[in-house]
């Protein structure tokens, strides 16, 4: 597993991964329209333009498996981590390996993460990496077109 800088070529892969209905359902808090390239490109332009963001491409067995990053959440002012792994890489420990390495590179603590309450796979990844549930909130999940429970986790 390798974490490297995101390249323009990676974006097409990330966009294709974002089209997966099962992945969208699990992630829940996704783009309004996962098929909207213009919105996707604008989001990534914003990510690239914000020097407080740290974003990496996850490479597994020589293939782009997904992305991982951290950002200052506008709703809390705290650093949050986020990741997306393509479905063809699920169940291989990719997310756990990537998150372990990524949080090891970040010196800032505490770190926060959010996950749909019923996304047990992602919750397990976060817990394996030392994150603890510290709260819950309700939020509108675009992928489900309804408000759902979201867990807030912290890594000290």
Which residues make up each language-model segment?
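Short loop/turn motifs at secondary-structure junctions and domain boundaries
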Residues: 46-52
């Amino acid at each position: 597993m390798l974490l490297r800088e995101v390249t323009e070529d990676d974006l097409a892969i990330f966009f294709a991964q974002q089209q997966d209905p099962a992945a969208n359902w699990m992630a829940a808090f996704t783009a309004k329209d996962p098929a909207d390239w213009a919105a996707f490109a604008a989001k990534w332009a914003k990510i690239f333009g914000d020097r407080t963001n740290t974003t990496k491409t996850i490479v597994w067995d020589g293939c782009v498996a997904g992305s991982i990053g951290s950002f200052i959440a506008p709703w809390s002012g705290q650093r949050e981590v986020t990741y997306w792994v393509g479905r063809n890489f699920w169940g291989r420990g990719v997310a756990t390996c990537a998150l372990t390495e990524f949080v090891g590179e970040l010196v800032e603590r505490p770190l926060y993460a959010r996950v749909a309450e019923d996304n047990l796979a992602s919750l397990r990844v976060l817990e394996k990496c030392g994150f603890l549930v510290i709260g819950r909130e309700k939020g509108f999940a675009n992928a489900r077109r309804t408000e759902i429970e979201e867990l807030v986790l912290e890594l000290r």
